[in-house]
Amino acid sequence: MGFLIIDGNSILNRAFYGIRVLTNSRGVATNAVTGFMNTLLMLEKDVNPDMIAVAFDLKAPTFRHKMYDGYKANRKGMPEDLAQQLPYMKKIITAMGITIIEKEGFEADDIIGTVSAACADKKIPCTVSTGDRDSFQLVNDYVTVRLAKTKGDIYYTPDVIMEEYGVTPKQMIEVKALMGDSSDNIPGVPGIGEKTALSLIKEFASVDGVYENIGSTLITKGVRTKLENGKESCYMSRQLAEICLTAPIDTELSHYVPKERDDNELARLLSELEMYKMLQKLKLHPTSAPAGSKEALEESAAKQIPAMPAGDIVLTQEGNVYAGAVGAPVKLSDVELKAYADSDSTKYTFDIKETLTVTGCERLKNNRFDTTLAAYLADPDSNDYSLSRLCAQYGVPEGNSIQEKSITVAALNDILNCKISETGSAAVLTDIEIPLATVLVAMEREGVSIDADGIKAFGKQVCEKAEKISREIYEYAGYEFNIGSPKQLGSVLFEKLALPSAKKTKTGYSTNADVLESLMDKHPIVPLITEYRALTKLQNTYVTGLLKVVGEDGRIHSTFKQTETRTGRISSAEPNIQNIPVRTPLGREMRRFFTAKDGYLLVDADYSQIELRVLAHISGDEIMKKAFLDGVDIHTVTASQVFNQPLEWVTPDLRSKAKAVNFGIVYGIGAFSLSKDIGVSVPKASEYIRSYLSKYSGIAHYMEQTVAKAKRDGYVETMFGRRRYIKELAAKNKNLQAFGERVAKNTPIQGTAADIIKIAMIKVYNRLEESGLDARLILQVHDELIVEAKEDCAKKVALLLKEEMENAVKLTVPMTVDVNIGKTWYDTH
């Protein structure tokens, strides 16, 4: 109820800096608009206002600039990616039926102040939404400031301000006059900080009161001198800090009742920005793309392409399976399901993996198309392939009944089939993704046996070691504290032990991994803290985390996700098998608790340097190809090339550095990241990269050509036709462009490697099924596959794995696989 006034610039800025960069396919940034709209919808729901307005600053100088030339002089200009979103934001707000208030010569704060004062005069409740504490001075019995915070907004009333600061809202002006405000370049009294300013105002009520009592014994000599020297600055700062309550704007509050929403304009704007989730939230459908655009051509092609061949639409709903002709699917009983799954009927699924999970079937014969997987291939940047999301994205009515939804899915299939056929990725769907779903579901059902007692005992050891280290940390600190608290840890490191630090921020000192790494040789407490963190993470994330997901059968059944990554790699959850730590000896111990059941062994097959072999193949670099063809260690060869040493002179340290350079090139990291990885200066890391690219000229040429082609086409592809669009290449922001170039370089390599792993999984699964061997594929972790096999056939399975994986695809260099057998995952390494 009441009036909601939003500080437009403040909320938009918070969204821009608080949300990772999002762009549409034309490179227009959308993160600020996305964040603002989410905030707006939340505010409308929470506050339910009768009247609403959004206040914005204008570029023109205000009366404060005329009063003080230095006002906000330290502010940098608005970032280009934010500036390009501002016009969109204002148009969207207007289309929402909300009034925007701007006034030349006045700031948004003054507009907010004037509106809130008008509300208070009329005894109408007013909520001010802002990320700026300057508005605290406006708070009274009718005006509440809702301060935007990451972990939940905070409501400031007179009582809350008194409790937090010990002063009244109006006295916040006096406090700011004394302490100044570095963000607005308000000088205040030099040398007076917030703590002193608050104590002075608590005692003397105002700036006038402070100067009237300048000789008081309650004011120390040092503070008195600062006050005397800074009196003129203090009074000027007070004028700058006080929000105007009489800005020349319309204060007839009834004029701010929201107008009817312009859904057509709103849909047009959000469609142009490709904000499909927001369209869905607002229950709007995308509009047609602008004539002549890439999107319009695709839409035109979609309309001309004939519908897909007749077949059954297969849907799941509330644990039931429905199948049948478009518009007429029927519910299948358990008995009917089994027969139907093995039938020759042409089937079109919506989320084949979910369908197999619900049905309990091992596979779905003659499944020709899957809507979810096709949508993933068409738009791998999305993180939502639900039916409602796809309907919003492609402008298809969703329907309510299962019969209507089958019509919806058929329409989506026609659109998506057109898209992936045009892009050449249809074969990725039919030959890789759909067959892979069968493999993933089988792996999830099988699970992997876990030694729960062993994990518990290991966890106890980890806790004991962490406890021992914590005692050593307390000895160095001189007292006990919460090591897990960045605030308390910062106090110990930078105040008690006086270690060098970056400047203290409002939230305290930074104690992140980079900071600790820079302090590693400054005090013996630092390596102990790093080790303590590693141990507590191991305990909390992996030991406790694994025990939580062990099923009644003594096995964990991880969920393998097929549509999560942009490169095509498989990810997993509950638990995330891909993240089981392997870099430290203690972390590697975790593998001991992944074990084969009684009478069985684990057979582990791991591709050797698959991404570098893919790089050699697609770049055609002769030196790298020769190394793989000759069976020479590629990292030793790279060390020889980069560091100009004969092969026999390459030391383990040089090989280690060369390995980091090799994989740094694959993952597209720059000199800064490489320097941190191998412990050298940034210039030295740059030198290594230049040397690498000069020696491996084929790779350098490939990188240049790939980036140039990606800039021209807007996308890159894997060897098999999986496409990834790189919107960042069209961005105006240089950092975004650089990121886009790195993605262009590494996606074809990583994506091709991911496709090869998937092809290998399908081949291994099918071969095991055909062989009759008592063995099941149970895990995929990065570049390795793990099979649980009966002891008497483990060696046969090892040969089968090696044969299928090494021959999954043909490259110009050999793919080699290391195969090991053991009772536990640890034993296979």
Language-model region placement:
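Conserved "right-hand" nucleotidyltransferase catalytic core of DNA-directed polymerases
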Residues: G230-E336, S343-I352, I402-I580, L601, ...
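Function-dense linear segments that define catalytic or interfacial modules
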Residues: T372-G399, Q403, T408, Q562-L647
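Active-site-proximal helix-loop-helix substrate-binding element of RNase H-like nuclease domains
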Residues: T99, G152-K176, S183, G319-L440, ...
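C-terminal polymerase-core module
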Residues: E467-R471, E475-P527, S694-R742, N746-P748, ...
